[in-house]
Amino acid sequence: MRPLAKDTGMSVASVTLASALQVRGEALSEEEIWSLLSLAAERLLEDLRNDSSDYVVCPWSLLLSAAGGLSFQDHVSHIEAAPFKAPELLQGSNEEGQPDASQMHVYSLGMTLYWSAGFRVPPNQPLQLQEPVHSLLLAMCEDQPRRRQPLQAVLEACRIHQEEVAVYPAPASLHISRLVGLVLGTISEVERRVVEENACEQRNRSCSLRSRLHQADGESPGAPASDALQPRRVSERSAETQSSLERCTAHSRNSFVNSTFAGAGPCDCEESPWYGSEPMLLAEAESSQPATSSPRNFLQRKGKFSRPEFILLAGEAPVTLHLPGSIVTKKGKSYLALRDLCVVLLNGRCLEVKCDMESTAGAVFNAVMSFANLEETTYFGLAYVEGEEFFFLDKDTRLCKVAPEGWREQHPKGSVDTFTLFLRIRFFVGHYRLLRHSLTRHQFYLQLRKDILEERLYCNDETLLQLGVLALQAEFGSYPKEQVEGKAYFRIQDYIPARLIERMTAIRVQVEVSEMHRLSSAPWGEDAELEFLEIVQQLPEYGVLVHRVSPEKKRPEGKMALGVCTKGIIVYEVRGSRRIATSQFPWRETGMISTHRKKLTITSSTTGKKYTFVTNSSKTCKYLLGLCSSQHWFNAQTGSKHPSHRFTGQDKFAQIASLSSAHQTQANPITWIQKLSCSENELCVPRLQDATGGQLGTSMENKQGFKEPGKERIGSSPYTGGEQLHSIGLNQKPAQTVFGTAGHSMCAGSNCLGRRTQICCFDSVSGSQNSKRKGLFGEPNQDIVCVMLKRDPVHGFGFVINEGEDAEQTRSGIFISSLIPGGPAERAKKIKPGGKILALNHISLEGFTFSMAVRMIQNSPDDMELIISQPKGVCGTIHSEEKNSTASSGMFCTDILSNRCQGRQSPHIHDQDRSVRGTEMAQGAGSCPPSPLQTNTGEIYFVELVKEDGTLGFSVTGGINTSVPHGGIYVKSIIPGGPAAKEGQILQGDRLLQVDGVSLCGLTHKQAVQCLKGPGQVARLVLERRGPRAAPQCPSADDRMGDVHMAVSLVTARPGRPASSVSVTDGPKFEVKLKKNSRGLGFSFVQMERGNCIHTKSDLVRIKRLFPGQPAEEHGAIAAGDIILAVNGKPIEGLAFQEVLHLLRGAPEEVTLLLCRPPPGILPEMEPGWQTPELSGDQRLTMATCAGSEQSPSLDQEDNWRDSTSLDAGEGLSPGPESSYKDVRQVKGDREKERPWAKSWMHPMESHPHVCKLHPEPETPALATSLEKDMRQNCYSVCDIRRLGSLELDRDGADGATCFLPESSSLTVDYEEYLTLTSASAGQLPCEECLEADSETIPLPQFCSLGALLKSSLPEESQGSESDWEDLDEPVDRDEVLRWTRSARQPLAAEP
């Protein structure tokens, strides 16, 4: 953070303008804008003179000081800064030369203040600004640089305004201070005083205490004699005191060291300046004690066993420290009342502190930190234990307020209760690189190591064994060469929790850990500790302070706990020894936290809903409130202020990335911090199950737990004598990255497989991990560069990317591994191998996996802008041949479309590559964006929509609190004529990834809707194409009024091969393993009888449709039309339809399918919409209620297609009234005259010798209304019960095939919902009887009332649930839910 001026230092208490506006909740006033404008213009001019204006002015880079100052920070994200960048900066360099920096800053400043003036102001309301300032801001925001106001003119306008206002105008700094006060007002007064303390005075005091404490043997040559600390004799402890210490630390003590001042006695407070607000330490350890500056000298002791530090030091004699007692004058007499306070350090050492009852926790804390020689005191605090929970003390808390009653009272015999405090970590950093000192990192290791051993921090068995081996490497060293096999060289209980030992037996665990230790290539010593921290910091419960609570209403399912971290609050359900996260409240979605007696209430700022929890006492309730306040305060501080120290290499990059108010884009171990918005920190953080495992499930406000690293700060104690905060208001934003799969690479060139590929290497690919760890702190600073690349027809963009740890890359993300010689990237002369791609075409890659980044580069336009963070070092290259680069390196090119490549890939990769080629050819043909039909599956595309009447023109479905896998947000329907429909690129089923830079990963449905309803008029969306199986786009109103043509698939043989020789088994066979979720397998199938086509020798079971977001669709290898050959090894050839259905439904949770993909042209395409003709809007039918039971008409036995239907389909099926039936016939007759394609069906199709033929039937079909199409598309239905006319294949010799319409039909009513099949709902199939093998007629149930139909159709879990699908638009009327469909001989479809 830069100082405001050379003589004025920026206060530590500084916040961003965006944070101040979030807390304030309204726009800036006109006077505040003038004040900011004046100070910012002066600051910009000063920075331009000093050539230090390498930043972009935006609400997240503008820092406000509590002293009224203003500065700018340069570590905001590209996503946040992009809307405020000058147009000439976004366009890059031009022929006219470099743009003027001052004019760019003028534009950014004007946009920032204009944004602040319109913060949360509805678009239809004017800004509350007078003409002078409004005109000035508009002039500053001109697109043309020459038309903008210069900075000197802006300053002159501010000066004129100051002269025109009142005689004594308020200074600009006063407005700044008030804005900062709004943010600081959300924390306790104690924390504010801590913030405003003079940092220099703290450092001086800390140095003085340390120098007094650590004088060797009490002899310091340069110290005055009066200040010398002289140790006294070592005395034996009495049995009484010994017993108390044993109770305090659970370890035996034999002796202790007592060091005090010579002649200690009552003293006057005026004799020393240290007797003011801070106590003076009067004792030090005896010279024989181990030096605290080298706490790990004992680690390589050669004993029978090597034991952890916190166990060895716990058995040593305690060290006595003396604090001066407070001078109490009573009736002219002074007296001193000392008590023994036991403080246990993280390394297990016990300190016996002699203190006064009136001493504060801050005095003891300062003395302990000085003794331990810990300089980074921010992360630590003193806590006492109550039950199994730690309660941290505020620095101003007096010990007598929290000590046991027996400790406060003075007994005649001198026996008092023991009062024990523990030094523990309160703020857990996101990564160990953020800690400056190795001793601080060692303290983190010690606490996490012990917490895992004591099972305070949960992790799975595999991770426990891995961490045990790393701890053994750190504390014992490498596996001993002279070790005798089978002989124990360590105590297993010192490294593995008792729970795992009991389950696996001690002998088995000992053998397994020893073997892992022998085979381990991990470093030893401090490097092993860092690797230990790296893994632990990815655990779900890392950094969370957990306290037991109860729900407001007692529930039988179990206990609850509340976890507080720097990102928010997590609600756990306690089941045995495990905690399962059920709800989470990030600060940005927490409006207020309040307490009333024993009740703690959390109010959501997005939904307004209140969540109440009950604690065991009012003090605990207030403590939790203060803890939340301190966590929120610490999050705001770390998110807005500039790093207080300079980092080098990776350290600086990680620190800037972590403390940025924009987002916490950190290195590889920090990938769990998901960026939910571009300027704040978020609660939900996906973690790794273990070091190499997959991600855990996520959740935001409802079920499915999910966690992130937290950092705890000294909070307000519920027991302080002062006023207690009873409610706090919270409003912030979040940050995210997504962890991808390591080991993949992708080449952005054109012919990278045809030439040698360069692989970036730093020192040595096979280098030791020790040198790798040391490089983390010694690399040069990172450069952030912006590069514009133009696609080359030969080399593409000219660089190769990969993801994950490669050589020295220890961060997660998308990295440039090498440059292609002669390519655009190399010609740019700015890109170096090893750099991390932060953004591509103004879209941050922090929310994208490797495959998504590949698709973005493949489908990007010819001009691409890259934001890269790269080291200053030069990387070497390793050349490999084409074979190695494709087989082992996993390289991918945008045009790897040759047959040789496809031969080595899976079937779904073939399809992707073919679609990629089609996309790139389309893009190369012109500059216009590709149409939705041209885009390939999985493509990431960018759309800007301008809201109309406050809506974007589409509705969404999904969310982390719904049953959609991974909690994705999908486009549910497109409103005809709306912004999305006009834009034309968005299709139903596409997945929404980002909205205005805010990632939708991990959001609930309501939160996603809230993001889409943001205050901006223009929404910038990032979507992922979900493939051709997504529902087609909703037709416009004009299309619905016109004719709707029936899509017909014509089957043709492949050229050059006789039709008689074509077989459905010619296609590739492959095996797929699917795991059922709560909704089943996620696909429907049809059974096609052998009489349908000459190429089928038996009945075929084919995949009809894949449901979005379900296991089959998520797997990626299955496509509509695939033939099912076997289920879990059992062939289905010859099985009846019902047997296949039961085989799939009765399968275990994991199902193995043997599939075959038929060659193109052999079988009809599986297009779900081709069998359903529709009526136009003016020909909709009305439904008449029919009482009584009616028997359904008998159906022909010549059904040739049996299409199964999902079990969650509607249950209200009934034949329609006769009048309506006649109307349908009339409608058909009228519409047939207008359809030329209907006539073409009546003639032979000689060009297709083996096309399907329909049976002649006199009756016309009942056409569905256009509402059916609307509902089928908008609701994304997967559960149609359609009884449409079926096709039959009938060979007709040389006459070809003639198509006729079905003979008979009837009407049914169907209510559809977007649900998927569950195997448990097998009995809910509306017409189960029709699926029986011997059934020749389909009895339809009697018609029921509309209310009963809706009630019976809705599953119980969806009624009154907050997780139901919600649209952004008005809900469909209940009457429109019912529709008419044809029900002739069309079979049913079922979903396994």
From Swiss-Prot:
- Biased composition annotated in UniProt, kind: Basic and acidic residues: 908-917, 1220-1236
PDZ domain: residues covered: 775-861, 950-1035, 1079-1167
The UniProt GO MF terms for this protein read: 1-phosphatidylinositol binding
Region feature (Disordered): 211-246, 903-930, 1186-1236
Q: Which InterPro entries match?
A: Band_41_domain (IPR019749), FERM/acyl-CoA-bd_prot_sf (IPR014352), FERM_2 (IPR035963), FERM_central (IPR019748), FERM_domain (IPR000299), FERM_N (IPR018979), FERM_PH-like_C (IPR018980), KIND_dom (IPR011019)
Spell out the Pfam families in the cross-references: FERM_C (PF09380), FERM_M (PF00373), FERM_N (PF09379), PDZ (PF00595)
- Its Gene Ontology biological processes? bicellular tight junction assembly
Give all residue intervals belonging to the FERM domain. Answer: 342-642
| Localization of this protein | Cytoplasm; Postsynaptic density; Basolateral cell membrane; Cell junction, Tight junction
Residues forming the KIND domain are 15-197
Q: Looking at the UniProt record for this protein, which Gene Ontology cellular component terms does it annotate, in alphabetical order?
A: basolateral plasma membrane; bicellular tight junction; cytoplasm; cytoskeleton; postsynaptic density
Name where it mostly resides: cytoplasm
Q: Does the keyword Repeat apply?
A: yes
Task: Check the record and name the Gene3D superfamilies matching this protein.
Answer: 1.20.80.10, 2.30.42.10, Phosphatidylinositol 3-kinase Catalytic Subunit, Chain A, domain 1 (3.10.20.90), Pleckstrin-homology domain (PH domain)/Phosphotyrosine-binding domain (PTB) (2.30.29.30), Transferase(Phosphotransferase) domain 1 (1.10.510.10)
* Free-text comment on this protein's domains from its UniProt entry: The FERM and PDZ 2 domains are necessary for localization to the basolateral cell membrane. The FERM domain binds to phosphatidylinositol 3,4-bisphosphate (PtdIns(3,4)P2) and is sufficient for membrane localization.
What subunit structure does UniProt give? Interacts (via the second PDZ domain) with CTNND2 (via the extreme C-terminus). Interacts (via the second PDZ domain) with PKP4 (via the extreme C-terminus); the interaction directs FRMPD2 to the basolateral membranes. Interacts (via the second PDZ domain) with ARVCF (via the extreme C-terminus). Interacts (via the second PDZ domain) with NMDAR subunits GRIN2A/GLUN2A and GRIN2B/GLUN2B (via the extreme C-terminus); the interaction is direct and is likely to promote NMDAR-mediated neural signal transmission. Binds GRIN2A with lower affinity than GRIN2B.
Query: What functional role does this protein have?
Result: Functions as a scaffold protein and likely plays a role in N-methyl-D-aspartic acid receptor (NMDAR)-mediated synaptic excitatory transmission. May be involved in synapse formation in cone photoreceptor cells. May play a role in the regulation of tight junction formation. Binds phosphatidylinositol 3,4-bisphosphate (PtdIns(3,4)P2). May pNF-kappa-Blay a role in the regulation of NOD2-mediated NF-kappa-B activation in immune response.
> Could you identify this protein by its name?
FERM and PDZ domain-containing protein 2
This protein's gene is called Frmpd2
